[in-house]
Amino acid sequence: MLFRSHNDKLVGTDTRGVTVTADTAVRKQRTLPFHIRLIQGENNLRAVAISTARIEGKSVELRMTFNGPQKQAILHLIAVGINQYQNSALNLNFAQPDAAGILKFFSAASSSLFRTVKITELFNNGATKTELLTKLQSLKGTAPEDVVIVYLAGHGESVGADWYFLPHEVVYPERPEEIRQKGISSQEIKDLVMQIGAKKVLLLMDACKSGFALQAFSARGVDERQALAQLARANGVHIIAASTKDQFASEVQELGHGVFTYTLLEGLQGQADGSPKDGIVTVRELLAFVEARLPELSLKFKTERQYPVAESRGMDFPLAAIK
């Protein structure tokens, strides 16, 4: 299979007559046409063939600089927060307020960085499987220079080696067949993220066992942190999951938020602005801040530390300008 990336983000795969042969075998050349929309500045294009045994062939890279009209990025934000499930026994306290807090921050704080902010909110009974998948599919049309943030807050559950985000209509999470039918699998999320047109993508998951989602993206038996690194490397995205595959995401009444989202907001509001301290919070600064701060804050309000799972691949980019 042939994998193609643009500035470290996977932009497509192809199996059209692609084979990986030993060095001693007779080699055949095949030309495959592709169309890639360049962004302002440096563009790094890479192609590599990978065998069914996941052995990489020799990659080919092409670097070019595009000096076209300067375009300011559009921020596309999808925020999902489910407090109220069809089965009220599943209700949460802070998933919807957490998503609303993320929406409020980016609506007010990032106007200097983005030409406009396009917001999609899916709360409670609006957060159905069909609606969420439709909104994620719409991101395929985003421009390469744009920024995409997808935030998911609600229940998460694992079935076998797969993790599922549970939309509003899930009633019986203890039934594997219902989870498979009504839940949104980690594989579906991965496939849709790969299709996003923007080259700057941040995925935030505030759900129980969300670290398990990242293990499901890779081969069975692979450690979740290795799996997360593979996912980010394959798709060129930055990802933060609230908890490991064995942990529950914490909600704290005193904070008015889940600990994970409270930590995110602390970082975005300026505490993550570190190296360099320039009044701008970048995605990598936010990842580093959450990794250090979340265990500390969760221990303060709970009896044990909550550890996020985070990985960064692709270009760094600004998220917030500190006023």
Which sequence ranges carry the predicted segments?
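Short, small-residue-biased leader/transition segments that mark boundaries at the very start
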Residues: M1-L2
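Functional beta-strand-loop-alpha-helix junction segments that form "active/interaction loops"
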Residues: G12-T13, G17-R37, I55-R63, A99, ...
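Caspase-like (clan CD) cysteine peptidase catalytic core
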Residues: Q29, I39, I74, K129-A153, ...
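Glycine- and acidic-residue-enriched helix-capping/strand-helix junction motifs
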Residues: Q86-K104, V252-L255
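Extracellular S/T/G-rich loop segment that most often corresponds to the catalytic His/Ser-adjacent loop
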Residues: V201-Y262
